[in-house]
């Protein structure tokens, strides 16, 4: 560790490194455990948007095949027909929730589930878990989530020991932009998809909101999300302090108002108590006079 780095950074780095090893071991346990405790159900996507997409693909298939029948020979037509039919078959399987490659991605699916449970970045499909799997997931989260928050906390201390204020804002924005570029490349984004969708997707991951259709491919996206969470957490803490300082005068006025209301209510309560006490004393005097 360089001598020019702040001691706070060096101490946080050593703690972060240790807890990262522990977290990786915990995620590895989940990667092995969850595939055995999950039974993905085949679900039919019966919404109108899914049906509309299937109809559009079928119409496109028929139109292209009809046009190519007139202009191309038999060999070219067969090759094109195979390509179009393969695309339509994939869309049809996806519509009915059938994933032919699911068995090959069992460990990747287990890693994604363990990462989502530990980082609180969802969503997860509860139907994918067996009854025992749901119980194990609860116990797994009780250990994994605090462990992950510890890693994020140490990363946040490293970040704030180097960058603060405007510099932290600039670093976070630049990192989100670079992460969106990497995400777009890894996910194979097309030119027809606006780049703002990649930025929005990255922002959802960094703020632990997540998105329904997100699936990480490889280890790189996980590393990007962890560092992004640390940056966003440090930024949120700084914004929290700024907001508290900004609204402190209003909070002080509100506390004074509450104090005045409490004193007023206390005085009313004391008045009622004194009235009740005086009435009781008068009744006691009347009873004593009756006996005399």
Swiss-Prot record:
InterPro entries listed in its UniProt record = 2pore_dom_K_chnl
Q: Name one GO molecular function term.
A: potassium ion leak channel activity
How does this protein lie in the membrane? Multi-pass membrane protein
Query: Where does the record place it?
Result: Membrane
GO cellular component terms? plasma membrane
Q: Report keywords, A-Z.
A: Membrane, Transmembrane, Transmembrane helix
**GO BP, one example?**
potassium ion transmembrane transport
Taxonomically, the superkingdom here is: Eukaryota
Asked if the Swiss-Prot or TrEMBL record annotates the protein with the keyword Membrane, the reply is yes
Respond yes or no to whether keyword Transmembrane helix is given for this record.
yes
Q: Where is the composition biased (Acidic residues)?
A: 282-292
| Chain intervals for the UniProt region annotation (Disordered) | 267-292
Its protein name is Uncharacterized protein B0310.1
């Amino acid at each position: 560790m360089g001598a020019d780095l702040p001691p706070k950074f060096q101490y946080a780095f050593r703690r972060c490194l240790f807890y990262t090893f522990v977290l990786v071991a915990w995620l590895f346990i989940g990667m092995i455990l969850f595939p055995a405790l999950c039974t993905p159900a085949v679900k039919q996507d019966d919404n109108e948007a899914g049906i509309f997409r299937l109809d559009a693909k079928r119409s496109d298939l028929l139109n292209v095949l009809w046009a190519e029948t007139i202009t191309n020979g038999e060999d070219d037509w067969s090759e094109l027909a195979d390509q179009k039919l393969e695309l339509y078959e994939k869309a049809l399987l996806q519509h009915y929730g059938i994933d032919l490659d699911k068995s090959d991605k069992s460990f990747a699916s287990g890693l994604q589930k363990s990462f989502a449970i530990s980082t609180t970045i969802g969503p997860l499909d509860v139907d994918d878990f067996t009854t025992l799997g749901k119980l194990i997931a609860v116990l797994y989260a009780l250990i994994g989530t605090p462990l992950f928050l510890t890693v994020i906390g140490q990363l946040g201390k490293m970040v704030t020991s180097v960058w603060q204020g405007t510099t932290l804002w600039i670093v976070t924005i630049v990192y989100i932009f670079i992460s969106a570029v990497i995400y777009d490349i890894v996910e194979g984004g097309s030119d027809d998809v606006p780049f703002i969708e990649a930025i929005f997707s990255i922002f959802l991951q960094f703020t632990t909101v997540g998105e329904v259709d997100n699936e990480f491919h490889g280890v790189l996206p996980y590393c990007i999300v962890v560092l992004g969470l640390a940056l966003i957490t440090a930024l949120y803490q700084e914004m929290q302090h700024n907001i508290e300082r900004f609204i402190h005068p209003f909070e002080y006025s509100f506390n004074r108002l509450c104090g005045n209301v409490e004193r007023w209510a206390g005085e009313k309560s004391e008045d009622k108590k004194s009235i009740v006490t005086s009435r009781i004393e008068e009744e006691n005097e009347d009873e004593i006079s009756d006996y005399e």
